Structure formats: structure tokens, C-alpha cells
Amino acid sequence: MAKIGSFIDNKYEILKKIGQGGMSVVYLAMDKRLNKQWAVKELQKYTKNANNEVVIQSAIAEANMIKKLDHPALPRIVDIIEEDKVIYVVMDYIEGETLEYVVNNQGAQSQDLVIDWAKQLTEVLHYLHTRTPAIIYRDMKPSNVMLKPDGNIKVIDFGIAREYKESNLNDTTYLGTRGYAAPEQFGGKGQTDARTDIYCLGMTLYHLITGKNPMEPPYEIYPIRYWNPSLSGGLENIIEKCV
């Protein structure tokens, strides 16, 4: 584990720990050359647990995937530093809160806000789907969308994203978040493609506009105007077409 005040690659000073998962620690760091703060994810390269090894390799693959992307709604990865026992991934430090935090604390969001977020999310999905090969995100949900202080969003956590391969017909065994994930993401009976992300987007918008978490009872999706008759019929149709 990196020490507070230490330097990584003689460039990034570790300021404080800002997050920790099972296989990684995230620090806030200062780039002394650019006078800019970055988030630095520390990954252990080796583990005695085979399952943990898979998680680590997935995180490394995620970093290499994001590093190739360039979109204002995606975090940038600016450096990947490999040392004897650890790998450091240097990326944008994103200020703000997740949309999950926002809806949990404020309830259903206004129609204007949700439409604005929907436009931003569809733009980033279009960007991903038009890469060569296309990138299928597979985990759109409020907790994976950061709302910045300026009102713009960032899509985070590419842990289960993949490059689309038409011949890969069985790629979907239990990947995704129940309530948001498309049916083909469970059971290994179908292939995920751009339509998978559209389904997840629809469920995300449903949660934001109704305040009803699809992961909680009644586990049934009603038209959004069932919950709020003043909402737009057009928005209701869009969400229903997504899912």
C-alpha cells in the first residue's frame, strides 16, 4: 500500500486514500509537474486466490480499454505504471456524487434533468458503440454515473465492458446488475450487443424519473405516468422502447 506523502514514478505525490475495494486502493494524488490532481488506483499484481487473480486481470484490461477512449463523459486514463508487485492506474479525479446518491437522497428527479442526463448518456453510448470494434458497456445504472458540480455526467466503472465480437455467442453468464441488466446478461443464452446497453439505459432512466429502484419490490416495471401522471408521454414511450 502506498504511503501518504510518497511519490509514484517520481511524478505523483500521494495525498490521501479516497476509496478501497477488495482488490484495489484508490488515492488522491498531485502531479507536481502539472499542478493537477489525479485519482490513482493501486492494484496488487499477484494473489494466492485464483478468483482474485481474475478480478485483477479484469481491472488491468479495463484500464487498457479506457486508455484508448476519448470522450468528455468518460474518465481519462493518463498513465499506467507497473512495478514489481503493484500496478498504478492514473486517471481523472472526478468531483461530485453518483446519480444513485442523488436519487436516494432527493427522490425522483425532475423531467428536465432526466432528459438532459439521458441525452448525455445516449451520446456516450453512441460513442462506445461506434468504436471499431464496438464497446458494449453492460453495466449502466445510477451508481455508475457521476454527476459533476457543473451538471455534466461521467460514466465510470468499465469492469464488465467488452469489445463486441459477432462470433462470440456465449459471453453473458451472470454479468450485470439485476434490476438494470438485460435478460440476455443472465444464463448465458444470448450475446450482449448495443441493445443490451439501451435496455440498461431505460432502466436507469426509469429509476431516476420515478425514484423507484428496480432492484427492490415490487420488481415490476409500470409506465412512468402510473407513478406521476404529469410526466411526458413521449418520455414514457422512449423508456418503454428501451426496455
Regions found by a protein language model. Give the residues of each.
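Activation segment signature within eukaryotic-like protein kinase domains
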Residues: 117-118
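C-terminal lobe helix-coil module of Hanks-type protein kinase domains
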Residues: 179-243
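Protein kinase catalytic-loop region centered on the HRD/HxD motif
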Residues: 122-135
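Protein kinase glycine-rich loop
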Residues: 15-21, 26
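Conserved short submotifs of the Hanks-type protein kinase catalytic core
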Residues: 84-98
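AlphaC helix of the eukaryotic protein kinase fold
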Residues: 47-68
